[in-house]
Regions:
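Mature-region segments of soluble proteins
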Residues: 2-4, 58-62, 66, 73, ...
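N-terminal secretory signal peptides and thylakoid transit peptides that target proteins
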Residues: 5-25
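C-terminal segment of N-terminal export signals and the immediately downstream linker at the start
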Residues: 10-16, 29-67
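Short, polar/charged, Gly/Pro-enriched helix-capping and turn/loop motifs at alpha-helix termini
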Residues: 24, 31-32, 141, 170
Length: 198
């Protein structure tokens, strides 16, 4: 039997919300360049993620894309928000590793319990419902002990925003997508002297 939480369309688009007052979010880790694949060297392919498993990464991508969807400008996927999160979990965000690992598993189980299918296979409206349930803390409590659903949701929300708005050198905001969306100049390099010559 399918169970769902009350669903209402947000009064404004998520893209509009992203443009209101979120310019100051900053990321904290270096981005990575592309990896050349050289035939004949017998090297193992580099793993897709530093911390996440492929299954965890696929689920988190879907969550991040609901938070910052693709429309007329790139969303969370194209701007590399998940790679920002993945890299930071192996550095300054290491204390959040278990929150992500347990939270993703609890969220996976929540979707199977309520909708009888993985989050990745749900319709857009069902995905919104599922995320709304953990945002409000109305997900099945038996599946959420540590972390609580709201703690997990707020952490993913904050880190997704940081990955979208931070400097590309930190692993997200590929091609300065958020700055271009907001019509901002690229920020100056810290420490550079910008005083004009007299």
């Amino acid at each position: 039997m399918e169970q769902s939480t009350p669903s209402q369309s947000p009064p404004v688009s998520r893209r509009t919300v992203l443009k209101l007052g979120l310019v100051g979010l900053i990321g904290v880790a270096a981005g990575a360049g592309s990896t050349a694949v050289i035939a004949g060297l017998g090297r193992k392919a580099r793993p897709k993620y530093r911390f996440f498993t492929d299954a965890e990464g696929a689920l988190l991508i879907e969550i991040c894309e609901q938070i910052i969807p693709h429309d007329d400008v790139p969303g969370a996927t194209e701007t590399g928000a998940i790679h920002y999160i993945d890299r930071q979990l192996c550095g300054v965000f290491a204390r959040h590793q278990q929150t992500y690992r347990r939270g993703l598993e609890s969220f996976r189980q929540t979707c199977l319990e309520i909708y009888k299918m993985p989050f990745e296979e749900l319709s857009g409206s069902r995905k919104f419902e599922a995320l709304r349930a953990i945002e409000l803390g109305s997900a099945p409590k038996a599946l959420w002990s540590n972390p609580p659903p709201q703690v997990f949701f707020n952490l993913v929300l904050a880190h997704t925003m940081q990955g979208f708005y931070g400097s590309p050198r930190h692993g997200g905001n590929r091609d300065y997508a958020s700055y271009r969306m907001l019509g901002l100049d690229y920020p100056p390099v810290t420490g550079r002297n910008h005083r004009r010559e007299a």
